[in-house]
A protein has these predicted regions:
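Extracytoplasmic/secretory-pathway proteins
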Residues: 1-144, 149-161, 166-633
């Protein structure tokens, strides 16, 4: 696995657009720092699937003349084409249905082709023929004469598609201009308009394509991701000119797509000036807040430590007032009648907390809680409220502990109910731990600092280790202490084993044996003979060798003790010292039994060694001591 891989949206986020923004059509447009669309969401056939609405529309048109299952079969089944051409139905509407299908399905190899996006060589481009377009035009004109509005509209759409995929793609533009006034404003109309936008895009005439895409964005939610992808950003001056011929809602859509690529803030302000009730600001606001928090929330699992209350607040204030101004969010939340007031109240509460305006944050979040109309929205408010309370703490007191204890167990145990959008809670868990740990360090309380957020090296100090052992075993813990002791990631067994390992590297073997006997890990078998010392230094080779003697962590320590006792008595000091030297070498990072130091507290499982353990895992002090002793004999 790559260490720079995807770590989840909650790695540095607590603001969930999945919860705060209601409409699903905006989901691909949520903020994603790694991909153009949220979740690397491809624009695939499914996102452009109108099959259900098409089947329903034809069913309503054909009535009892053709069952819905048959309609579906003729529209989409590969085996139906031959039957379509051979059928001679008596019903006029069914005849027209088959006539349309004969043209539409005969040309699917051109108009509905799928291809391998990685295959640049074998893709062939074919064009629809004029004869097919003429047949479709005849059917369209016949339907107009008969005043069959449904069929005429369907044939009009087929003509738009055939012209777009012809060698004269631009012909679809003129045809649309000549015929669009007579078309009802259905989804099919906007799907036809989409071909016109595509023709303009092919000409790189974005001043013409963008307004059309805005109309489609406004009317066909399922195409919002597609048209946003096809949109090309232009200057503000150009956009103002283009928007003149659009309705206020369409102008809002134009600015929404532009805000996706440029400034969400500017786009939101333009949209609100046109229509304060426009829903298009929702996904833009969520993107702005997600961008802001990504710069604020740098204290995740692999992020920065929180050095002090003051430093944290200086950082958040700078981001929320300079890098990402937020006055406009607060003003809008207070004064504007927006489409999604819940979203604005949550956003205002969240950014107020970053501005160190904690009481204002409480006010906004209290309003949001009253507006929350489902459990997920209520949980979102509760999460951000908890973050606000933690960020507001200048010092930790029993009163603060009691207040936080109302919500912390809920957050640690939180699981979204089935069918409910999940909160982004991962960062919150880490941030709360780091914040409380920082405050406890300031109070000179190393035990609670370690319990709330563990750091490597804590157990290198004997007095801290002893204090933690005593704390974990005490019976009269407060409810606050009990909560953190249960959540603490290490057990007494982990502590005993880590102490045994640390004692070994200090050559305190008797103590190491006594400690190892307290832990179940005493029986863990080492992957190689730790006393081998071959010129060919190959750990994998050592692991593959048959083992005449299988050493556990405990029996390994006991054997080292036996050899050291022999050295002290002068019993074969050369061989015993050489073997003990091998033991210390093989138990280092470079040796064949690195397994010996695997322990949750020491936490050195990878190919790197953290600085806290360089002195024992990379240091040859003990090995060198015994090799030199062997050399003397």
């Amino acid at each position: 696995a790559c260490i720079d891989g995807f770590m989840g949206y909650d790695y540095n986020s607590a603001f969930s657009p999945e919860v705060t923004v209601s409409q699903k059509s905006y989901t691909p447009l949520f903020y994603d720092s790694d991909y153009l669309f949220y979740g690397n969401n491809y624009i695939d056939e499914q996102s452009r699937d109108f099959s259900q609405t098409d089947i329903q529309s034809w069913s309503e048109y054909l009535g009892k003349a053709l069952p819905k299952e048959k309609i579906k079969y003729y529209l989409y089944d590969k085996e139906a084409l031959k039957e379509i051409h051979q059928s001679a139905p008596s019903d006029k509407k069914v005849q027209r249905f088959f006539s349309l299908l004969a043209i539409a399905r005969d040309n699917e190899a051109i108009t509905n082709v799928s291809y391998n996006r990685w295959d640049y060589d074998s893709r062939k481009v074919a064009y629809t023929q004029q004869a097919e377009i003429s047949k479709a035009e005849t059917l369209y004109q016949d339907a107009l004469k008969d005043k069959d509005e449904f069929f005429a509209h369907r044939m009009w759409y087929q003509l738009m598609r055939l012209k777009f995929y012809s060698a004269e793609r631009a012909s679809v533009i003129d045809y649309f201009m000549q015929t669009e006034a007579a078309q009802p404003r259905t989804d099919l109309y906007y799907r036809g308009m989409h071909y016109v936008a595509g023709a303009y895009i092919a000409q790189k005439n974005y001043a013409k394509s963008n307004p059309l895409l805005a109309q489609i964005f406004n009317k066909v939610p399922s195409l919002r991701q597609t048209v946003t992808y096809e949109y090309r950003p232009l200057s503000a001056e150009q956009l103002h000119k283009l928007s003149a011929g659009l309705s206020p809602q369409e102008q809002c859509a134009l600015w929404a797509m532009d805000g996706y690529y440029n400034s969400e803030k500017d786009a939101i302000e333009k949209i609100l000036a046109l229509d304060s009730q426009s829903p298009y600001v929702d996904f833009l606001l969520s993107r702005y807040v997600n961008r802001l928090e990504a710069k604020v929330n740098i204290y995740g699992s692999y992020g920065e430590p929180i050095s002090s209350y003051k430093a944290y607040h200086q950082h958040t204030l700078a981001v929320a007032t300079q890098d990402y101004p937020t006055d406009w969010i607060l003003t809008t939340a207070k004064d504007k009648k927006v489409a999604n007031p819940y979203l604005w109240q949550v956003a205002a509460g969240y950014v107020s907390s970053f501005r160190n305006e904690f009481n204002e944050a409480r006010t906004f979040l209290s309003k949001a809680e009253k507006m929350a109309d489902n459990p997920a929205k209520k949980a979102q408010v509760r999460l951000i409220s908890l973050l606000n309370e933690v960020a507001a703490l200048e010092r930790i007191t029993p009163q603060a502990e009691q207040k936080l204890l109302k919500d912390l167990p809920w957050l640690w145990e939180y699981k979204a109910p089935e069918g409910q959008e999940a909160l982004r809670s991962g960062y919150a868990l880490v941030f709360i731990g780091k914040s409380l740990s920082m405050l406890y360090k300031a109070e000179n309380n190393p035990i609670m600092a370690e319990l709330t957020y563990s750091v490597k090296g804590y157990y290198r100090k004997e007095e801290q280790t002893a204090a933690m052992e005593q704390f974990l075993q005490k019976k009269d813990k407060t409810p606050w202490e009990t909560f953190w002791a249960k959540k603490y990631q290490y057990t007494l067994n982990d502590i005993y084993e880590s102490k045994a390992i640390y004692a070994f590297y200090e050559d305190q073997i008797t103590e190491a044996i006594a400690l190892m006997k307290k832990t179940p890990q005493e029986k863990a078998i080492l992957p190689a003979n730790p006393f081998n010392g071959k010129i060919r230094d190959c750990a994998d080779c050592e692991h593959a060798l048959p083992k005449k003697v299988k050493y556990t962590k405990l029996s390994f320590l006991e054997k080292v003790k036996e050899m050291e006792d022999k050295i002290a008595k002068g019993d074969d000091p050369y061989n015993n010292a050489l073997l003990v030297g091998n033991a210390f070498y093989n138990a280092s990072y470079f040796g064949s039994v690195r397994f010996f130091y695997l322990n949750p507290i020491i936490d050195e499982y990878g190919y790197r060694v953290s600085a806290e353990h360089w002195d024992i895992l990379l240091n040859m002090k003990q090995a060198k001591k015994y090799y030199l002793l062997a050399k003397e004999h």
